[in-house]
Curated annotation (Swiss-Prot):
Domain WHEP-TRS: 3-59
Taxon lineage: Eukaryota, Metazoa, Chordata, Craniata, Vertebrata
Quaternary data: Homodimer.
UniProt-listed SUPFAM superfamilies: Class II aaRS ABD-related, Class II aaRS and biotin synthetases, S15/NS1 RNA-binding domain
Domain of life: Eukaryota
Identification of the protein by name: Histidine--tRNA ligase, cytoplasmic
């Protein structure tokens, strides 16, 4: 017991140490190192407790989904998939884990969030961090130079999640990408159109899509005097401007990353600007940026992009924002990110902040990193942050107390008298064979009232009632659960009548 008490004291002291580091705003690396020590101590403490103290729960950053939550999820996925297919995308899938070497060096400072799998004496493996790098690997492996694809799957990040804000360690991404050599900005404009179509269809609130270009960022850093070696690390600091103030970002640049204060101030003059095509034209005349080749190329492409966005009718939802940086290393051109302008809530409630709900950009060099000959395949794409969208939809449903159906059952096969199980089984089988979504209660002689109550609770719209008289007459009594109206339908016409009432097309199964 003395050893256990000593271990508990070590856990307490280490926990206090970690909290102190966070209050002092120590570096992320230092905090992570001390958190790792704390977790090891806790694991040791857990082993001492034995199996009888095991707490049944899901791992940190993960969750189970109830039938109600899955019904919401399926509706969201359906909206997204229909949009992807409307734009001509094919679907692919890739392994949930990749060779560690495949993922290494693609994510900048976020590489520390990759989950490495324990070495089993073979290949070094990691869980996928996103769907973009595996897609680039897939293109290079299969020597593909042209494809429009979508992919919906889980990804994994060793993050400190805020699950109430839709942030997890295991979560879905819904990606759409266009690979191939095309005229400038046409595929990029379509990706932004898709993003706007999906977010509008989901009706989760007003949103704004911020756009920028990595070439403009790099040109801006160059003219401000940022050393080449610090471009990516300063970029990751700028990327935090949607979460913290400019002063905090500046302090990080100067205090942690060694940037001269006057250089940081010059960056601040640029990154606090946002607007439309007029800002693009203004920056093309900027005395410093206009002398930088990369910046001029990026601004020229953005000007063309805005022309296409006007034609697509979505320019009112787009803002050129010089603070948008997107920390991932593989972006090479246009980048974009959608954020909610407001979160609809009940009066008096705090808005639910969920951060970015969709993002993407151009990554022309990523495939070349995997190709043996370094052949590049230009790519542009987007990713929908569905977990955050689920958080918004769930909160909205809870606030409205709206009933969510968790099944698609169209009709319950019921009986009004006893000893009709065989007839119910025959009828439900006929309905299944005809493609009708049907159920029956698993009792030989269920009470009619119980069967009707089940329909009301499950949201089943129709009841097909069998009785002795109906069997003699060759009819089925079809009851509407909502109106309680009943009509006799000839058995051979029942399938068509159910389809008509539930607006179901002819089954293709």
């Amino acid at each position: 017991m003395a050893d256990r008490a000593a271990l508990e004291e070590l856990v307490r002291l280490q926990g206090a140490h970690v909290r102190g580091l966070k209050e002092q705003k120590a570096s992320a690396e230092q905090i992570e190192e001390e958190v790792t020590k704390l977790l090891k101590l806790k694991a040791q403490l857990g082993q001492d407790e034995g199996k009888q103290k095991f707490v049944l729960k899901t791992p940190k950053g993960t969750r189970d989904y109830s039938p109600r939550q899955m019904a919401v999820r399926e509706k969201v996925f359906d909206v997204i998939i229909r949009c992807f297919k409307r734009h001509g995308a094919e679907v692919i899938d890739t392994p949930v884990f990749e060779l560690k070497e495949t993922l290494t060096g693609k994510y900048g400072e976020d590489s520390k969030l990759i989950y490495d799998l324990k070495d089993q004496g073979g290949e070094l493996l990691s869980l996928r961090y996103d769907l973009t790098v595996p897609f680039a690997r897939y293109l290079a492996m299969n020597k593909l130079t042209n494809i429009k694809r979508y992919h919906i799957a889980k990804v994994y990040r060793r993050d400190n999640p805020a699950m109430t804000r839709g942030r997890y360690r295991e979560f879905y991404q819904c990606d759409f990408d266009i690979a191939g050599q095309f005229d400038p900005m046409i595929p990029d404009a379509e990706c932004l159109k898709i993003m706007c179509e999906i977010l509008s269809s989901l009706q989760i609130g007003n949103f704004l899509v911020k756009v920028n270009d990595r070439r403009i960022l790099d040109g801006m850093f160059a003219v401000c005097g940022v050393p080449d070696s610090k471009f990516r690390t300063i970029c990751s600091s700028v990327d935090k401007l949607d979460k913290v103030s400019w002063e905090e970002v500046k302090n990080e640049m100067v205090g942690e990353k060694g940037l001269a204060p006057e250089v940081a101030d010059r960056i601040g003059d640029y990154v606090q600007q946002h607007g439309g095509v007029s800002l693009v034209e203004q920056l093309l005349q900027d005395p410093k940026l206009s002398q930088n080749k990369q910046a001029v190329e990026g601004l020229g492409d953005l000007k063309l992009l805005f022309e296409y966005l006007i034609l697509f009718g979505i320019d009112d939802k787009i803002s050129f924002d010089l603070s948008l940086a997107r920390g991932l290393d593989y972006y090479t051109g246009v980048i974009y990110e959608a954020v909610l302008l407001q979160m609809p809530t009940q009066a008096g409630e705090e808005p639910l902040g969920v951060g970015s709900i969709a993002a993407g950009g151009r990554y022309d060099g990523l495939v070349g990193m995997f190709d043996p000959k370094g052949r590049k395949v230009p790519c542009v794409g987007l990713s929908i942050g569905v977990e955050r969208i689920f958080s918004i939809v769930e909160q909205r449903l809870e606030a409205s107390e709206e009933k969510v159906r968790t099944t698609e059952t169209q009709v319950l096969v019921a009986s009004a008298q006893k000893k009709l199980l065989e007839e119910r089984l025959k009828l439900v089988s006929e309905l299944w064979d005809a493609g009708i979504k049907a159920e029956l209660l698993y009792k030989k002689n269920p009470k009619l009232l119980n069967q009707l109550q089940y329909c009301e609770e499950a949201g089943i719209p129709l009841v097909a009632i069998i009785g002795e008289q109906e069997l003699k007459d060759g009819v089925i009594k079809l009851r509407s659960v909502a109106s309680r109206e009943e009509v006799d339908v000839r058995r051979e016409d029942l399938v068509e009548e159910i389809r008509r009432r539930t607006n179901q097309p002819l089954s293709t199964c």
